[in-house]
Curated annotation (Swiss-Prot):
Organism taxonomic ancestry: Bacteria, Pseudomonadati, Campylobacterota, Epsilonproteobacteria, Campylobacterales
Positions bound to dCTP: K109, S110, T111, Y112, A113, R114, Q154, Y168, Q178
Protein name from the UniProt record: dCTP deaminase
PANTHER family assigned to the protein according to its UniProt record, in alphabetical order: DCTP DEAMINASE
Summary of the function given for this chain in its UniProt record: Catalyzes the deamination of dCTP to dUTP.
SUPFAM superfamilies according to UniProt: dUTPase-like (SSF51283)
Gene Ontology molecular function: any one: nucleotide binding
Uppermost EC category: hydrolase
Gene this chain is encoded by: dcd
Length: 188
């Protein structure tokens, strides 16, 4: 399995729509950086957030109650305040169409990590298509700003040594084609 370089990421995005919209260079002046890097792509977080609150006493991943989260639009302010020790969901500006022979791993940006903001995203499986739901945790005892439409995490692409027999699309992945923030689902 090989780590893919900027030239491959650029070609796959411009010729095959792997990342859209695609920024061919790293943008980083007066913003948290985003765009193409040497061996990855820095994704941006949109302006819509879902802040988890304590209206209900329990989070159940098998039976998630949407009332456990409050939708917040940060488009006007340009940022979202994540309360101390809080958790929120968001989504990428970029839409992904993963090749069948490629898996992507997403890692939080050091700018946020150094402020106690932890970003988690599960792997982008072969032939996954959709916007990416981003999990954001504030591990500090202080409120923190998360900037809308700026960098939030870096995606690295790993191409398999051989083609997988069954992709995410082939098995009807439950988050295939997701748009916006997608809450937990269980196939029934």
């Amino acid at each position: 399995m090989g780590l893919k370089a900027d030239s491959w990421i650029k070609k796959m995005s411009l010729e095959h729509g792997m990342i859209s919209p695609f920024c061919e260079k790293q943008v980083g002046k007066n913003v948290i950086s985003y765009g193409l890097s040497s061996y990855g792509y820095d994704i941006r977080v949109g302006s819509e957030f879902m802040l988890f609150d304590n209206k209900n006493a329990l989070i159940d991943p098998k039976n998630f109650d949407p009332n456990n989260a409050t939708k917040i639009d940060a488009s006007k302010e340009g940022f979202f305040i994540l309360p101390a020790n809080a958790f929120a969901l968001a989504h990428t500006i970029e839409y992904f169409k993963m090749p069948k022979d490629t898996l992507a791993i997403c890692l939080g940006k050091s700018t946020y990590a150094r402020c106690g903001i932890i970003v988690n995203v599960t792997p982008f499986e072969p032939e996954f298509e959709g916007y990416i739901t981003i999990e954001i945790s504030n591990t500090t005892n202080l409120p923190a700003k998360v900037y809308a439409n700026e960098g939030i995490a870096q995606v690295v692409f790993l191409q398999g040594d051989e083609m997988c027999e069954q992709s995410y699309k082939d098995r009807g992945g439950k988050y295939q084609g997701q748009v916006g923030i997608t809450l937990p689902k269980i196939l029934k």
